[in-house]
Amino acid sequence: MKDMPKSDKLIARLREIVGEAHVIQDPDKLKAYAVDGKKPKVVVTPGTTDEVSRVVDYASQEHRAIVPRGSGSKIKMGGIPKKMDIVLSTSQLNRIRDRDCENLTLSAESGLTLCEVQQGLAKVGKGYFLPLDPPFTDKATLGGIVATNSSGPKRMLYGTARDMIIGVKAVFPNGDIVVSGGKTVKNVSGYDMCKLLIGSYGTLGILCEMTFKLLPLPEKEATLGLSFARLEDADGFVRELRGSQLIPSSIEILNGLAVQKMSHSMSMPPNGNYLVAVGLEGVVESIDRQVSEMSEMAKKYGTLEAVTLDAEKHQAFWVALRNFSSRLTDEYSNVISMKSNFLISKCGEVLGSYEKIAQGLGINCAYISHAGNGILYSHVLPGKNFRSRIESFVELIEKMTAEAVKNEGSLVVESSPISIKKKVDVWGQSRSDYLVVRRLKDQIDPAGILNIGRFVGGI
């Protein structure tokens, strides 16, 4: 092996570790694993944590850059990779290790999809679930959800992966296998490595197995859809709802373009320029009472129409909302998707400001606001003249970023064409904790092999 070319040596060693069937080097197949136009030299699909450890250990010794990958649903997020030799796919890490519904815990490998987990849990007894609802729920893997700390509308009631995870098994950049936490919900001794890895985008370690808290399935779920003519009216209703004793699981505000693009899968009010969708979970009597009270509350703000969705229609609406971004990219080329975070009380104000900025530049945007969380997704539909308008899109991003910062928040470009990524920092303005993040990366990954260039500040 000493006399082999480096590329042949890499392939040979990976085959030794995981077996020939789990090493992909066909140029045509590698295209599917490209990130921002960069194609890996090889894709490897280890089947155990030990195999992941051996692959990473070898890559570290040979200074080979690794990009971890689950289903690829979030692969467009982040900066352009500085280097990408190996894509390490977790697709073969797809087993449930322990399902203990009596103690409300689940241990599963990182390549398992959330959809598969939820389907299995729903069949146990009266049903259980992992209270996470990130985008791309049908494809998103547990590892990808945790690595990006991805969340959805139900974050309002249940929190994020950071609140649900109680244990991890991961491989650090030197190949060491690290175990932190466990099945005990209140495990607080020592440093919390779980929290360190959540939202690190695969730059500090590769998640292999995780333990989560579970909850029993609610007796009923429903959605109340309310249409409004003006953003001020929709926001006024949402403000009162947030301050009330009612307990929705999610509150969404959609502008007219977002409603239009979702109409294929919706049974929602067609009238009005804005839609407020309120998710509810619990016992039947509680949901019926809350729907009645919310409907009366909305009348004070001039609601045009109200619709209640149950069962399949309820599920179809939220699936369509979570998959909104992927539907747009399937339908249009060069879509730009941005995620803003700010104070919850500023949701309506920021949405209104974003609309004025986009209208001033003649740009069409679909907006979906998680109004219960202080999160706003802005999806830019570039149209036919994308190349000639790149500077306008850059100006839009810069102005929206400034508006988010003004409201004590931030903006991240979650997906965009490479031409946009080359002109803006997709992570937005520098954070005050950047030096801490940089030092952590240097300490844990001194060889610089994991997801290089894709995280905050080009880490």
Label for each model-derived stretch:
Residues K9-R13, E232-K261, I344-G362, F393-A404:
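Short amphipathic alpha-helix segments
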Residues A21-V35, I66:
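N-terminal glycine-rich anion-binding loops that anchor highly charged ligand groups
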Residues L14, A34-I66, M84, T90-F136, ...:
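N-terminal glycine-rich flavin-associated loop
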Residues Y33-D36, M77-K82, M266-M268:
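Short glycine-biased active-site loop of nucleotidyltransferases that positions the nucleotide triphosphate
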Residues K2-M4, K39, R64, R69-S71, ...:
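Conserved glycine-rich FAD pyrophosphate-binding loop
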Residues G47, L226-R230, V278-V284, S340-I344, ...:
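Short beta-strand-to-loop capping motifs
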